[in-house]
Amino acid sequence: MAYEASLIEKKWQKIWDENEYFEPKDDLNLPKKYILSMFPYPSGRIHMGHVRNYTIGDALARYYRKIGFNVLHPIGFDSFGMPAENAAIKHKIHPKSWTYENIAYMKKELFSLGFSFSKKRMLATSDPLYTKFEQEFFIKMFEKGLIYTKEANVNWCEQDQTVLANEQVEDGKCWRCGHEVVQKKMPGYYVKITAYAEELLKDLEELKDKWPNQVLTMQENWIGKSEGLEFSLNLDEESKQKTKESSLEVFTTRADTIYGVSYIALAPEHKIVQNLLSQNLLNQDVLNKIKAIQNQSPRERQSSEKEGYFLGIYAIHPLSGEKIPLWVANFVLADYGSGAVMAVPAHDERDFEFATKYNLAIKQVIQTQENLPYTQKSGKLIHSQEFDNLDCNEARLKIISQFEAKNIGKRVVNFKIRDWGVSRQRYWGAPIPMIKCQSCGIVPQKLENLPITLPEDVQITGEGNPLDKHPTWKNCICPKCGKEAQKESDTLDTFFESSWYFARFASDEKTWQEKALDEKSVKYWMSVDQYIGGIEHAILHLLYARFFQKALRDLGYLTQNEPFDRLLTQGMVLKDGAKMSKSKGNVVDPDEIIEKYGADTARLFILFAAPPAKELEWNDDAVEGAYRFICKLYDRAQNVKKGELVELKQENLNKEEKYARLKVYEALKKSFEVYHQSFAFNTLIAACMEALNALALCKNEALEQEAFYIILNILEPIIPHVCFELSEELFKCKNFKKLELKEEIFVKDTLNLAVSINGKKRAEFEISSSASKEEILAFAKENTAKWLEGKSIVKEIYVEGKLVNLVIK
């Protein structure tokens, strides 16, 4: 009977569905595994990147179910966001309709691949019930001071008419639509992620060896802890009069280089710069250039060519008394440190580049024979008055102590990470559950009024926020004073939704109506044992999710410190050397692959083509090869003896049979390492192929039965439909249990040894594994007699189980 993928796959998907095979068990005393792949945005169709992500997670989930774990393997949809509004404009369809139609289609696609997701715990973040508890979290965080309002410069996308977080600006453009981003001053809500900066940094230690080093480094750099000196510099008298300021604060991590300061660089937003601008003390050209810098995102400022302008004012060096010119510069950020940088060109590459460009003084204060800038934090100080000849570290500590003693400076810790702006001026998002009252100011909604849902009678035009234009939706009564008030019309950044969905999945779905998170369930299931997703989420989603876990812990919802125990970042799927995209015309439709070859072929190719963490190059021939392997497996299974296994005795097998059995058990041994540790599915599949090839040379019915029993177990998480089908035919599915290694199979009857003479290989021979060292050496000499003739052996070396080396002269 020929292999018919479609019939087999539909049959088993129906059986699994009817028997709720993949729902987590209610018994919370069982050992558990929570396997989670990052959920998709419902764009309309899944792509090969999704297939790869979910195949990896599904293989792990199926494996752990098979060996007796209670497995939670959920899926949902990150369903709020700007693309739905863009689609509404383009296709004249409501964002909600577009979103839920896409979800319905993508659900069919996902289950057609045999993914073992829990259907009962499926959710969309745009569901009112999800919004309700998200709004509850927002209010609780607001009441605790973890969310606040302020007016600040924000990244503004003119195309999408919304605010973007720093992390959502890529090369000066919107990460979603690619449009230019400008700076705009606006009021908004901010999440105080900086309150957890120290803990977020410290707890990265817990994730070492469990998360990719690259992700840990990216997060460490983004948090950006630096310890240093914050100190005051007085302005000279003329500058005081111009700026209406008497001094400015500066932060430095290199107090040891303070005598090398040749200029102070200020952010364009610094109060001193703004005072000069307000008094028209800068010419129009400088004014225009400062405004241009202000329109750059923080990331652009850091990466673009260094630019600056002398402000015509001076500060006084606090120790030497020298006058230091003040410049405005594009590389200084207003919200890092004090928005002012002490520049030491001799010992900092950026400062050196700037000083060279504008012909500013370069003062060396650390002794070195190397070319400047010398940026190492080691060496003896020079030109530093009483601190000369001290090494850098000692000088740094003494200089800080002197500043503290004079009460003009102090030790401080700074972080690069900024508070997270979550206000978005768009319709298709979770409404911010706050009220603006003329009498009371900003007031939270009452919890019993949640969820605050979106009105459906809106016009999506792409111009401004539709909620602002709605005739009645904003109108409400202030819960504090009872007067007329207005709802907040901004909606939440969609990263707010994806920052806690994993905890919602961990809650028993029977409690979803009553509470955000079920204490008993989340205590059992959290943290996620294995999280799988792209490296592109290293900073955005993964950092926000870590913050949410800690904030919800402190609010009493969760108990764990970290949301994800282990993290796997899978590589991209490429075709013709480039990431698949419609614009490049290199997209492969998963539906077409399933229709032509079946889901198991797609799954097998995805896991065999490359290790999960590496990029995967799509190859049509390799897909054909995966299909042929499954056909071959199916065809050969038709000749395997059905029923109970016959016990094999190792001593009764011939050489070829022992070798084939060894290859089968080597594959089994590898499966334990792959499923538990390395996820190198490609090597496991290769080991199974090798075992089947060795088995083809044998004519032992009982051995073939045992081999298929084991190999179907190994491959079931990877190609489940065909393995369930064959296991039902051959073993009535009784093989789905934990398999154990038989160590006697790994004991070899014979050894294959190499013989070297003076380090050069001369012969190979086979000998019984029970042979003594003396017998092995004698056999080695016999096999190399022609090279030993007329020579004397001065040394005999035997490396057990590997080789013999004879040293002659």
From Swiss-Prot:
ATP binds at K582. It is found in: Cytoplasm. It is an enzyme of class 6 (ligase). The keyword Aminoacyl-tRNA synthetase applies. GO terms for cellular component: cytosol. It catalyses: tRNA(Leu) + L-leucine + ATP = L-leucyl-tRNA(Leu) + AMP + diphosphate. InterPro entries: aa-tRNA-synth_I_CS, Leu-tRNA-ligase, Leu_tRNA-synth_edit, M/V/L/I-tRNA-synth_anticd-bd, Methionyl/Leucyl_tRNA_Synth, Rossmann-like_a/b/a_fold, tRNAsynth_Ia_anticodon-bd, Val/Leu/Ile-tRNA-synth_edit. Keywords: Aminoacyl-tRNA synthetase, ATP-binding, Cytoplasm, Ligase, Nucleotide-binding, Protein biosynthesis. One of its GO terms (molecular function) is leucine-tRNA ligase activity. A motif ('KMSKS' region) lies at residues 579-583. It comes from the Bacteria. Its main location: cytoplasm. Signal peptide: none annotated. A motif ('HIGH' region) lies at residues 40-50. The keyword Transport does not apply. GO terms for biological process: leucyl-tRNA aminoacylation. PROSITE patterns: AA_TRNA_LIGASE_I. Its EC number is 6.1.1.4. Belongs to the class-I aminoacyl-tRNA synthetase family. NCBIfam families: leuS_bact. This is Leucine--tRNA ligase. It comes from Campylobacter jejuni subsp. jejuni serotype O:6 (strain 81116 / NCTC 11828). The lineage of its organism: Bacteria, Pseudomonadati, Campylobacterota, Epsilonproteobacteria, Campylobacterales. The gene is leuS.
